[in-house]
A protein has these predicted regions:
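Active-site neighborhoods and metal-handling regions in enzymes and metal-associated proteins
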Residues: 1-453
């Protein structure tokens, strides 16, 4: 919401014009004319008041700001996208700010983070590590075409003695800069993986709003509804409860459409008597939920629908139970897969565990936070990690099983906060048992009397 900005964070306080600074933020100037067209800007005063940064300057001041980047041991930054366009009328747009940063850091035209990382690894390794270096280098050159073209790396790989390798290390050292675009993303992954208490509260709000949407649709659903109408009810609830956006494109798939994992067309005019898979999440103050329910449009599961639903529900229960501190990111998936394999075998839909990916082709969990698929380290779960648990079974038409199963798609997704006291289902407000869903669908809806001309 505040584009064309730069944030500098120092590991140790830097003195600039007699002021000690831990961080510096550069933002756009207030401009009544542009704000009339594009919306309110924070400016310096707003950034200090609302964001809490004590040292704020206009972005036009970044070019001349007195920071010698070359004297730092490392300058950590995110890789730049190549699609940033230059607004020639703005000398402090993102394009210009990136160029100013590159000038300040003597950014090489041929900067390659993988090459720099490999140079650094080779030059800091001693002779006792030669075998490991050779393996890493060989794998890197084999899998990265750009690295394979590098003369120094190719020469190092073919060097026949330590004297040659030592000379090549010196040449590599001369080309290593203090620029590092690998470490900062890893640091941010760790910060985003473990939620602060304040973040948990915002996520609880986003998740609750999303669960309310599911509940209201359960009450309002009837077979003559369109997928887009169902989507509209969800998103109306989001806005009614203060969510600024949807966290991702809304998925409402009736019948066979539910077998398309990221189905966002939502254009089926009548859902009929099919199951309706609804995967939607409200975004509240930049934090997004991700909640999925699958419900029968006529209010009652058929025998076949319920048989599949029961397997997915049991798989989700196993996945949630596996979401504990110390477990690996794949633990919920392994638990869910075991249940789904057993269930599909019992129904005769598969004969062997190797067939399960035909009907359960995705993972069970991902991190949740500022993004619907949030960043994380994929290390063992810690207290206040927030993940989804979302097993599913999808049986497209013409699948190699009894046609009575064709077109059934079920996914149940909840947002699980992992704590030292066990997993907490933050989206439990929306019923997920088949009996609970059917009972909710019998409840009256505030939309029953809402008739448009």
């Amino acid at each position: 919401k505040e584009p064309h900005a730069v944030l500098l964070i120092y590991k140790e306080a830097q003195v600039v014009d007699g002021v000690a600074m831990d961080d510096v933020l550069f933002v756009q100037e207030r401009d009544p004319l542009r704000e009339q067209w594009d919306g309110y800007r924070l400016g310096i005063a707003g950034a200090k008041e609302k964001l809490g940064f004590p040292n704020v300057f206009f972005n036009t001041q970044f070019t001349d700001f007195k920071t010698d980047f070359n004297r730092f041991d490392q300058v950590l930054f995110f890789d730049f996208n190549n699609d940033v366009r230059d607004d020639v009328r703005n000398n402090a747009d993102l394009f210009s700010l990136i160029n100013s940063f590159k000038e300040k850091t003597n950014f090489p035209l041929d900067f390659n983070v993988e090459k720099t990382s490999l140079y650094r690894y080779i030059t800091t390794s001693d002779t006792n590590s030669s075998a490991n270096v050779a393996q890493v280098l060989s794998r890197s050159l084999r899998t990265n075409k750009d690295l394979a073209k590098d003369a120094l790396l190719a020469a190092y790989q073919s060097a026949i003695n330590e004297r040659q390798r030592a000379e090549l290390k010196q040449q590599m050292s001369a080309q290593i800069t203090n620029l590092n675009s690998q470490t900062l993303p890893m640091i941010m992954d760790g910060l985003r993986e473990i939620k602060l208490p304040e973040e948990v509260e915002l996520l609880k709000k986003a998740i609750y709003i999303s669960a309310v949407g599911q509940v209201e649709v359960m009450k309002a659903m009837y077979p003559d509804m369109s997928e887009r109408e169902i989507q509209g009810i969800h998103e109306f609830v989001f806005k009614k409860y203060g969510a600024e956006y949807e966290g991702y494109p809304s998925i409402v798939g009736g019948g066979h459409n539910g077998c398309v994992l990221h189905y966002i067309t939502n254009d089926k005019p009548i859902v009929g008597s099919d199951l309706v898979l609804m995967d939607l999440g409200a975004e509240y103050h930049n934090y997004t939920a991700d909640v999925t329910r699958t419900i029968p449009s006529d209010g009652t599961f058929s025998a076949e629908q319920r048989a599949i639903y029961d397997i997915v529900y049991e798989a989700q229960e196993a996945g949630i139970a596996a979401s504990v501190v110390g477990a690996g990111m794949r633990a919920p998936h392994y638990a869910a897969v075991e249940v789904i394999v057993k269930g599909l075998k019992a129904l005769g839909i598969i004969q062997d565990a190797s067939e399960v990916r035909k009907y359960f082709p995705h993972g069970t969990s991902h991190y949740l936070g500022l993004d619907v698929h949030d960043a994380g380290t994929y290390s063992p779960f810690q207290h206040n990690t927030l993940i989804t648990v979302e097993p599913g079974i999808y049986i497209p038409e013409n699948s190699p099983c009894d046609p009575k199963w064709w077109g059934i798609a079920v996914r149940i997704e909840d947002d699980i906060l992992i704590t030292n006291d066990g997993p907490i289902n933050l989206s439990a407000y929306a019923p997920r048992t088949p009996d609970g869903i059917e009972a909710m669908m019998r409840e009256p809806s505030v939309l029953d009397a809402f008739v448009l001309p």
